[in-house]
């Protein structure tokens, strides 16, 4: 799996970086969010606790996927802005009992 950063935008109003990327994975299925997040964090020297993978989109018959991630400068702001289901999906918070 190879990740290429296509665009990085700084959103100063919200306090985050928005990262667009392409993943090349010839002969392999779409990589997991956990694998992609780990590689992005290592490539860009980010904090995994404040990095969220918004989406990874694969195209039928292609070995290339596109994705979008957000890196927040402050964890409290991330918890305030990001929807709960995204935080659960990325393993940042635990699902509440009974839901």
From Swiss-Prot:
Superkingdom in the source lineage: Archaea
Entry GO CC: ribonucleoprotein complex; ribosome
InterPro entries assigned to the protein according to its UniProt record, in alphabetical order: Nucleotide-bd_a/b_plait_sf, Ribosomal_eS24, Ribosomal_eS24_CS, Ribosomal_uL23/eL15/eS24_sf
One GO molecular-function entry: structural constituent of ribosome
GO biological process terms held by the UniProt record: translation
Pfam families, alphabetized: Ribosomal_S24e
Keyword annotations from UniProtKB, A to Z: Ribonucleoprotein, Ribosomal protein
Keyword Ribonucleoprotein: yes
Family: Belongs to the eukaryotic ribosomal protein eS24 family.
Entry protein name: Small ribosomal subunit protein eS24
